[in-house]
Curated annotation (Swiss-Prot):
Keyword RNA-binding attached: yes
Primary location recorded for the protein, binned into one broad class: secreted
One GO cellular component term: extracellular space
Family named by the database record: Belongs to the NICOL family.
Location within or outside the cell: Secreted; Cytoplasm, Perinuclear region
The protein's name in its UniProt record: NELL2-interacting cell ontogeny regulator 1
Keyword Glycoprotein: no
Organism (species): Mus musculus
Quaternary organization: Interacts with NELL2; triggers epididymal differentiation. Interacts with cell surface receptor TFRC; the interaction mediates uptake of NICOL1 into fibroblasts.
Upper classification of the organism: Eukaryota, Metazoa, Chordata, Craniata, Vertebrata
Length: 90
């Protein structure tokens, strides 16, 4: 066997590998008794729905505000264009 392969298969390395696997396996087990019953958990869907309702209301307000601002700017532009057509002496 090659020296590098022999050092990988040494009893010390194998023991360390087995201990690491055992510790990782023990940590991955779920804790017993820590489950929260469904009745006492917050309704995630309800909270998400309320959040989306508020976000939609905010978007509607923003859209209305932008629409009103656009209308104002268009009226100002039309007024400027109309006033530019009239001679200053009239």
């Amino acid at each position: 066997m090659a020296p590098a392969l022999r050092s990988l298969l040494s009893p010390r390395t194998l023991l360390l590998l087995l201990l690491s696997l055992a510790l990782l396996g023990a940590r991955a087990e779920p804790a017993t008794g820590s489950a929260v019953p469904a009745q006492s958990r917050p309704c995630v869907d309800c909270h998400a729905f309320e959040f989306m309702q508020r976000a939609l209301q905010d978007l509607r307000k923003t859209a209305y505000s932008l629409d009103a601002r656009t209308e104002t700017l268009l009226l100002q532009a039309e007024r400027r264009a109309l006033c530019a057509c009239w001679p200053a002496g009239r």
